[in-house]
Amino acid sequence: MLYHLLYPLAYKLSLLNVLRYPSFRIVAAGLTAMVLGLLLGPIFIERMRVLQYGSTNVREDTPDTHKKKAGTPSMGGALILASVAIATLLFADLANRFVWAALLVTLGYGAIGFTDDWLKISKKNSKGLAGKKKLVLQVLVVVVVYYACLTDWRFHVEHRFPWVFVGSYVDLHVTLPFVPSRLFNPDLGFLYLPFMVFVVIATSNAVNLTDGLDGLAIGPTVVSAMTFLALSYVAGATIAGFSLAEYLRVPYIPGAEELGVFCSAIFGAGVAFLWYNTYPASVFMGDVGSLALGGGLGMMAVLTKNEFASAILHGVFLTETVSVILQVWSFKTTGKRIFRMAPIHHHYELKGWAEPKIIVRFWIISVMLALVALLSIKLR
């Protein structure tokens, strides 16, 4: 918004020329989101406490250390989303369809998570929105955003249906990390949309499963946001006519550098939230935060053409999800459990690990995986 309002005035005030540079707006968005989160955090937490909007999502078989957390203010993800939305709308180029796609999916998944949290709080139970309904809504959000923001429609009066689908603004090819595109670069065609839906929903639900300890989900989330900031800038930026994507032999995506503003906003809002979510947490993000942030990260994987590389980057989230799948499969087929409790972070709790130790070690692993994902840019 500021880019569109103030940059045209640069001929009168040369200082405003900085708005033309994505790098400046990326930093500004991150700082804005961080300041907003830090300033509004205490107000939000106190309001949630007064309204008694506390966590009810405590399982009967949960470790004893979690039972004392019942009643901790929840739905802190709403604060994250507000900070992200404000910072993105202020500093991003709002003519960029990629920015709108990422932001709308994030907010759409936030609305789903908000509904889930509200049902849990109002009914005083941990069930919330039915799983099938949640899945249908998640699919619907991605499909609607894809056709609204990422496809080209042309108006032709001579056709029976005047609006004609022309093509997609998203490259329908996929690549593998560490594998040259000349060896693996298939065009998925009409199968790409279902694949895109799967990536976004899987990432969203994986972050949701990881959000079980204080700061456990938000830590890897901010690491992923910074990684995608770098990946999006490499994919779209040109410096004095020099393309970073061409040099590194990764897909060139014009306009992708603007996604750095969105990623920086997530980073800033996430760090601010971590200030209040670190052990022992003063507030939980709730499904409104975990589903939304996961959806946003999933969209970043799609828009920067790192769908498979995101499996490395999101290794912590993936491990948590796989642990649940294996636990359910083993119990249903053999009657035995592989882990003491799933997701796997609870397994380590029951083994006697202190909660802060689990959290910090998972953060360290997420940083290591992010570095491996970044290596995949060059090693192809």
UniProtKB/Swiss-Prot annotation:
The chain crosses the membrane at residues 26-46, 75-95, 98-118, 135-155, 161-181, 183-203, 222-242, 259-279, 283-303, 311-331, 357-377. It is found in: Cell inner membrane. It holds the Pfam family Glycos_transf_4. Its cofactor is Mg(2+). Keywords: Cell cycle, Cell division, Cell inner membrane, Cell membrane, Cell shape, Cell wall biogenesis/degradation, Magnesium, Membrane, Metal-binding, Peptidoglycan synthesis, Transferase, Transmembrane, Transmembrane helix. InterPro entries: Glycosyl_transferase_4 (IPR000715), PNAcMuramoyl-5peptid_Trfase (IPR003524), PNAcMuramoyl-5peptid_Trfase_CS (IPR018480). Pathway: Cell wall biogenesis; peptidoglycan biosynthesis. It is a multi-pass membrane protein. Its EC number is 2.7.8.13. GO terms for molecular function: metal ion binding; phospho-N-acetylmuramoyl-pentapeptide-transferase activity; UDP-N-acetylmuramoyl-L-alanyl-D-glutamyl-meso-2,6-diaminopimelyl-D-alanyl-D-alanine:undecaprenyl-phosphate transferase activity. It catalyses: UDP-N-acetyl-alpha-D-muramoyl-L-alanyl-gamma-D-glutamyl-meso-2,6-diaminopimeloyl-D-alanyl-D-alanine + di-trans,octa-cis-undecaprenyl phosphate = di-trans,octa-cis-undecaprenyl diphospho-N-acetyl-alpha-D-muramoyl-L-alanyl-D-glutamyl-meso-2,6-diaminopimeloyl-D-alanyl-D-alanine + UMP. One of its GO terms (cellular component) is plasma membrane. GO terms for biological process: cell division; cell wall organization; peptidoglycan biosynthetic process; regulation of cell shape. Catalyzes the initial step of the lipid cycle reactions in the biosynthesis of the cell wall peptidoglycan: transfers peptidoglycan precursor phospho-MurNAc-pentapeptide from UDP-MurNAc-pentapeptide onto the lipid carrier undecaprenyl phosphate, yielding undecaprenyl-pyrophosphoryl-MurNAc-pentapeptide, known as lipid I. Belongs to the glycosyltransferase 4 family. MraY subfamily. This is Phospho-N-acetylmuramoyl-pentapeptide-transferase.
